[in-house]
């Protein structure tokens, strides 16, 4: 730390402020840890997703075979894929529980409305990550689930038809849909999610944790 302090004056104070920042006593229970646990699940997915991306091939001909290879041939591949899968399921559950806690305790009220909106966007992004990731194994279950998702989007008024074509890359499910979902899942949605997470935590730090009801 002294080496860093000599080259980046003030970094020690920043680290100390982060590590020793006091929190209200009423937050010392599991219900106030749901947001942090959600972040942990997201980080697990980021790390395991990087390893999975090393072997996954986003083409209709090779996607399923590459997933099978990861599961059956790559060392610890089945473990990494299972961690990614269960962390994804757990993250969705934790996001809903976290938002229920925030709503029940009234933590979304003034002056924290913007942070509540950021949390709502994070919920949508989490569902988007789950949906786009579901297609990637490109098996029968994931294929038809994606077809249903595209048809559901297509039923929306005004913008539905355009959304459906954008999702599918045409009038029906094609290889374009797999490549688009892959880019969304591994690049666009994670980066947007990280941006909203940074904003979310900055607002928590500035405004503090809300008082109990």
Swiss-Prot record:
Compartmental location: Cell membrane
PROSITE patterns, per the entry: CYTB_NTER
Keyword Iron applies: yes
UniProt-annotated binding residues for heme c: 33
Gene3D superfamilies: Cytochrome Bc1 Complex, Chain C
Signal peptide: none
Details of cofactor binding: Binds 2 heme b groups non-covalently with two histidine residues as axial ligands.
Protein name as catalogued: Cytochrome b6
Species the sequence originates in: Heliobacterium mobile
Taxon lineage: Bacteria, Bacillati, Bacillota, Clostridia, Eubacteriales
Gene this chain is encoded by: petB
């Amino acid at each position: 730390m002294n080496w860093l302090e000599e080259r980046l004056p003030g970094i020690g104070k920043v680290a100390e402020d982060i590590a020793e920042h006091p929190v209200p006593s009423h937050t010392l229970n599991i219900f106030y840890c749901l947001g942090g646990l959600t972040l942990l699940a997201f980080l697990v997915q980021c790390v395991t997703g990087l390893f999975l991306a090393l072997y996954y091939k986003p083409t209709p001909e090779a996607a399923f075979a590459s997933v099978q290879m990861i599961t059956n041939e790559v060392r610890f591949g089945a473990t990494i894929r299972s961690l990614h899968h269960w962390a994804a399921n757990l993250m969705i559950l934790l996001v809903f529980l976290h938002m229920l806690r925030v709503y029940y305790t009234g933590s979304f009220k003034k002056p924290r409305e913007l942070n509540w909106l950021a949390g709502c966007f994070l919920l949508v992004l989490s569902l988007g990550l789950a949906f786009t990731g579901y297609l990637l194994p490109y098996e029968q279950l994931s294929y038809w689930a994606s077809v249903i998702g595209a048809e559901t989007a297509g039923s929306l008024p005004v913008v539905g038809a355009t959304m459906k074509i954008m999702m599918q890359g045409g009038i029906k499910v094609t290889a374009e849909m797999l490549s688009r979902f892959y880019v969304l899942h591994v690049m666009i949605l994670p980066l947007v999610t990280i941006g909203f997470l940074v904003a979310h935590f900055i607002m928590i730090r500035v405004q503090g944790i809300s008082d109990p009801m």
